[in-house]
Amino acid sequence: MSSSLAFENVTCLRGGRILFEGLGFVLAAGEAGLVQGPNGVGKSSLIRIAAGLLAPLGGRVRGDGARALLSESAALDAERSLAAALGFWAGLDQRTAAVGAALDAVGLADIADVPVRLLSTGQRRRAAFARVLASGAPVWLLDEPANGLDTASIGMLEARIAAHRADGGIVLVATHQPIGLPGAREIRL
């Protein structure tokens, strides 16, 4: 899995104020970055910049490999079954065959036919993570991935992240909650 992610002297402006400036780091295959800081300092904005959804005021972001984003929103059609909602996104990446394994990996295979609107908060969060798994992207951008998850689900998340890194993937995680990312590069805002 060939992947890299680099921030070079990146500055972020939101709401007329600079959240961070001159930010630089490089993540290579198998590495993780842990973005931490209090609410409102730009953790989510950093993830959005990495995803290409927000342009930096200055500097640039470079990288190799497709990126998969887990944001606050699950980005799943509430009226479709869980499998169909994930299938839509997986189809964009020509990876519909990966949906079943992704649902199994997050412990939701038994409710694949349930409409997304009926899922609990934790189930929706795991479903959103299944979307990342099914994408096959080597670079994962995870914004508050543990929100709404119980202890067992956090353990599953940590195990999947570790396996992805062991396979040469990159993970950039923004969180204010404790999450196990051994050897992660700390990016404090």
For each of these PLM feature ranges, what is it?
Residues 115-122:
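Conserved ABC ATPase signature
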Residues 129, 168:
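Hydrophobic anchor residue at the start of the ABC signature
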Residues 140-144:
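Catalytic Walker B motif of ABC-type/P-loop ATPase nucleotide-binding domains
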Residues 1-26, 55:
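A short, flexible loop at the N-terminus of ABC-type nucleotide-binding domains that lies
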Residues 51:
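Helix-to-loop junction immediately C-terminal to a conserved catalytic motif
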Residues 73, 78-93, 98:
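Q-loop/switch helix immediately C-terminal to the Walker
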Residues 97-111:
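Conserved ABC ATPase "signature" region
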